[in-house]
């Protein structure tokens, strides 16, 4: 079967944004204008196509990334061919950043949606950082231009100041707030007005209003200069005072967008049906096809030092990345995969190179939100859901059996909050185990473990909302009723001092004894090093080599259980440099226990301290309540980082320990009579003040 759409006509894009910037509404409009939907769904009616989980429809937010395929030939059918869009709608709530992260990993370009009234918000900064990490070229779409306080050029300035990128407006607004009536296309230098009769599908072009002419010329000059900087040929033409043609302007802007030097900025109001078709045109003009992004890098499964790469080409060996696992009530497990190279036909066997297991692909479907169209093959650049995979988790590579490769994996953050869950009845016990393991398979930022001391099941995630939704899904999808305990903070422990400690385990009581003896030098690890950095400096065979791994294992086991209050110990450098052994009585177990005993002594000798997760908190409040809000943040051991004015009120930025933030949603609402809102995200671990740490250690009963 030949390729139906040439790869140059593909656009794999994500729609990403802050929680209320209007991302899902924008996606719904895209589906309407591209003819996938014949009727528009509205988020506030709970009818949006992309929000297909019940929880999403109830809460009016998007939790999982739904993937959809659509076609577009231009707002006035100006392109000679139909382009194929694979669109992923991502959540904007900070507890679900993991969904955004894994979407950006497999996309070629992104449309970042900002609210014209609220501008750059905390979550926009997070999304931007993630897009930088994966070098994703992007467009900025300033939405909600009909809202009170909307100001396109203010948002453009914020993108530059706060996100450190160079935005290049290619449109300007005509009117604002309730008088927002259209936009100026700076490339063509025409005013555009949308036709309400066909819900903004078509528009008419007119001359630019006289009062906006000077502003348009000023911003067009900025745009042309940005385009000219793409290459010497355009720059020379520009410097010699020649006019750049429309094609040259677009080519220059495209080249610089793909190189992540600039971000073209467009505007509109998705809800009022103004501007979305031009966003789609800009995706074609300025965002890359799969063949225009650098080849994806990977390593040889048998030799990590050996690097390899795959190009977006049907003739190269097959390779794909599984970026999401979802459970479907009708077909079981769906594995969403992005194909980077080669061709896969249903029924083929592939290798999961991360786990070293072969899998057979049963069926393949292309998703439109949660409706499915069955397909027979996928090719380089495609995004599809595979059915019948047995043992694939997020981030695994699927590849040709005879040409194995492991593609670069995704990093997932560790959870910062835990709660105990108990099934309400004995019958729920087994069902809960199955439900939690399925949910953990879908979501790498959600973890499940059993507390060894209390035998309780502990679930951990990225925030209170994240865990609420997990419990809700257990009830709805698996019929498990569960009680949940109070949230617990994921504290960590580390050491501040370098010290040398002797670990000795000797037991001689008839029969074969036990003898393990080692000297270990402990030190804080280098900045950014989380786990154990282990070195062996034993010389002269004072400890035989076969016992060294047991010493490392003893240290690692004790690190899991901590030395102060039972929290995991992180950031440790350990060097075993001396010791002794007994010909008969020494064993791996004896050395493991000796090393564990040495590690335990770090609580006194290593200056062990507790670390707590610190959150970046941003509160938006009317000025009248600002004093109360700031006083309250100070009481919560918050450090105020700064403040600024926005049309919505004062924005207060602070860093606050997570342990002080439980129940904050209720408190901030009652303080401000329901008018303040806040968002928070994890920034780093920091040392707990001694007075607070004493209480935590005492509570843990150590």
UniProtKB/Swiss-Prot annotation:
**Record-level Gene Ontology MF annotations:** GTP binding; GTPase activity; guanosine tetraphosphate binding; translation elongation factor activity
What keywords does the record list, in alphabetical order?
Cytoplasm, Elongation factor, GTP-binding, Nucleotide-binding, Protein biosynthesis
| Region annotation Disordered: where it falls in the sequence | 293-314
Where is GTP annotated to bind? 17-24, 89-93, 143-146
Q: What is its main location?
A: cytoplasm
Claim: Nucleotide-binding is one of the keywords in the record = yes
Is GTP-binding included in the keywords of this UniProt record?
A: yes
Could you tell me where this protein is found in the cell? Cytoplasm
Can you list the GO cellular component terms from the UniProt entry?
A: cytosol
- tr-type G domain residues are 8-291
Family, per entry: Belongs to the TRAFAC class translation factor GTPase superfamily. Classic translation factor GTPase family. EF-G/EF-2 subfamily.
The record's annotation in PANTHER family points to: RIBOSOME-RELEASING FACTOR 2, MITOCHONDRIAL, TRANSLATION ELONGATION FACTOR G-RELATED
Q: What does this protein do?
A: Catalyzes the GTP-dependent ribosomal translocation step during translation elongation. During this step, the ribosome changes from the pre-translocational (PRE) to the post-translocational (POST) state as the newly formed A-site-bound peptidyl-tRNA and P-site-bound deacylated tRNA move to the P and E sites, respectively. Catalyzes the coordinated movement of the two tRNA molecules, the mRNA and conformational changes in the ribosome.
Name this protein carries in UniProt: Elongation factor G 2
The species is: Pseudomonas aeruginosa (strain ATCC 15692 / DSM 22644 / CIP 104116 / JCM 14847 / LMG 12228 / 1C / PRS 101 / PAO1)
């Amino acid at each position: 079967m030949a390729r139906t759409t040439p790869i140059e006509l593909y656009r794999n894009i994500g729609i990403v944004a802050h929680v209320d910037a209007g991302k899902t509404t924008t996606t719904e409009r895209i589906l309407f204008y591209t003819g996938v939907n014949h009727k528009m769904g509205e988020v506030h009616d709970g009818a949006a196509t992309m929000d297909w989980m019940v929880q999403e429809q109830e809460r009016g937010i998007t939790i999982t990334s739904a993937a959809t395929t659509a076609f577009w030939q231009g707002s006035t059918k100006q392109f000679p061919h139909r382009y194929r869009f694979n669109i992923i709608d991502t959540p904007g709530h900070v507890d679900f950043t993991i969904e955004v992260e894994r979407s950006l990993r497999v996309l070629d370009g992104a449309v970042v949606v900002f609210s014209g009234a609220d501008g750059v918000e905390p979550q926009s900064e997070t999304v931007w950082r993630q897009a930088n990490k994966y070098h994703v070229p992007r467009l900025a779409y300033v939405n909600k231009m009909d809202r009170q306080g909307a100001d396109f050029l203010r948002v453009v300035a914020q993108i530059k100041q706060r996100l450190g990128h160079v935005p290049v407006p290619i449109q300007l607004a005509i009117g604002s707030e309730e008088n927002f009536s259209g936009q100026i296309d700076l490339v063509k230098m025409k005013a555009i007005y949308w036709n309400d009769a066909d819900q903004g599908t078509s528009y008419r072009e007119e001359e630019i209003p006289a009062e906006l002419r000077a502003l348009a010329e000023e911003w067009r000059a900025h745009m042309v200069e940005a385009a000219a900087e793409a290459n010497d040929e355009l720059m020379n033409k520009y410097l010699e005072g020649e006019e750049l043609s429309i094609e040259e302007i677009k080519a220059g802007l495209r080249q610089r967008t793909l190189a992540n030097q600039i971000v073209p900025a467009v505007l509109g109001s998705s809800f009022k049906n103004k501007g979305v078709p031009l966003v789609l045109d800009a995706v074609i003009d300025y965002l890359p096809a799969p063949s225009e992004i650098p080849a994806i890098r990977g390593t040889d499964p048998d030799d990590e030092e050996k690097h390899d790469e795959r190009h977006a080409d049907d003739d190269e060996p097959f390779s794909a990345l599984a970026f999401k696992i979802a459970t479907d009530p009708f077909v079981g497990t769906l594995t969403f995969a992005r194909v980077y190279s080669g061709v896969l036909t249903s029924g083929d066997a592939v290798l999961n190179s991360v786990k070293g297991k072969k899998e057979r692909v049963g069926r393949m479907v292309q998703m439109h939100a949660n409706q499915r169209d069955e397909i027979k093959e996928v090719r380089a650049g495609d995004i599809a859901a595979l059915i019948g995979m047995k043992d694939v988790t997020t981030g695994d590579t699927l590849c040709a059996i005879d040409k194995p490769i492991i593609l670069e994996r995704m990093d997932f953050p560790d959870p910062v909050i835990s709660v105990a869950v108990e099934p309400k009845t004995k019958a729920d016990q087994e069902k809960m185990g199955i439900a939690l393991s399925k949910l953990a398979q879908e979501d790498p930022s959600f973890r499940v473990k059993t507390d060894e001391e209390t035998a309780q099941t502990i679930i951990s995630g990225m925030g209170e909302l994240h865990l609420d939704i997990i419990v809700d899904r257990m009830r709805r999808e698996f019929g498990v009723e569960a009680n949940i305990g109070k949230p617990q903070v994921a504290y960590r422990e580390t050491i501040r001092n370098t010290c040398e400690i002797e670990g000795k385990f000797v037991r001689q009581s008839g029969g074969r004894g036990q003898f393990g003896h080692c000297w270990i030098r402990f030190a804080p690890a280098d900045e950014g090093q989380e786990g154990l950095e282990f070195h062996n400096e034993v010389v002269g065979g004072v400890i035989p080599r076969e016992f060294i791994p047991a010493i490392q294992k003893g240290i690692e086991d004790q690190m899991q259980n901590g030395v102060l209050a039972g929290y995991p110990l992180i950031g440790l450098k350990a060097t075993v440099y001396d010791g002794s052994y007994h010909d008969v009585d020494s064993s791996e177990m004896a050395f493991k226990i000796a090393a564990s005993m040495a590690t335990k002594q770090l609580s006194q000798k290593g200056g062990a301290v507790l670390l707590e997760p610190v959150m970046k908190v941003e509160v938006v409040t009317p000025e009248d309540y600002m004093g109360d809000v700031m006083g309250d943040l100070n009481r919560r051991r918050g450090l105020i980082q700064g403040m600024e004015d926005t049309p919505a009120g004062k924005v207060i930025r602070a860093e606050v320990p997570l342990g002080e933030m439980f129940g904050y949603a209720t408190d901030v609402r009652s303080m401000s009579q329901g008018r303040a809102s806040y968002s928070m995200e994890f920034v780093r671990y920091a040392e707990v003040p001694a007075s607070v740490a004493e209480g935590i250690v005492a509570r843990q009963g150590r």
